[in-house]
């Protein structure tokens, strides 16, 4: 059993490079390069272990709770996940594990569930500290915290349980 988490740093690199002109189009070239890199990673992994189930985790939008109105970011994450899934599906014993919804929205945070929320009415309402994603580390509101990792683990385990019969071989017992 092999788990792989890739892609998040690639996305952040594009965001930092294009912070003032960020668009969905900014990610097209980097996504293609990422897909090439992911293909190489999976090929190398498969050369070392031809039978193991490989579970590749998707990425999540850490900005969703505080900025649900930035729809382009959600589109970018969805496109990135689709690009990942496209590569993963080329290997019959590799599986894509989506985590965007469970991390971005899975804790029941009000802002995450209400995407039609009106613009903040006061300076206080716009304070990033007023809304928190309970699945992210409080110090950076970016990386998963214990709750976030538990949610991710649950998604991975659901995928393993659903697919293990395709790659898990029972040892001959004598």
Regions found by a protein language model. Give the residues of each.
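Extracytoplasmic/secreted proteins, especially bacterial periplasmic and envelope-associated proteins
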Residues: 26-29, 33-40, 44, 75, ...
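Hydrophobic, aromatic-enriched interface-forming segments
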Residues: 38-44, 48-72, 76
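Oxyanion-hole/transition-state-stabilizing segment in secreted/luminal serine hydrolases
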Residues: 1-30, 59-63
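Second-shell loop/turn segments in exported
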Residues: 23-32, 68-74, 137-144
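A structural motif corresponding to the C-terminal end of an alpha-helix
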Residues: 40-53, 83-97, 159
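Structural recognition of the beta-strand scaffold that forms the well-ordered cores
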Residues: 1-5, 12, 53-58, 95-98, ...
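Substrate-gating cap/lid alpha-helix
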Residues: 62-101
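Histidine-centered active-site loop/cap adjacent to the catalytic His
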Residues: 121-174
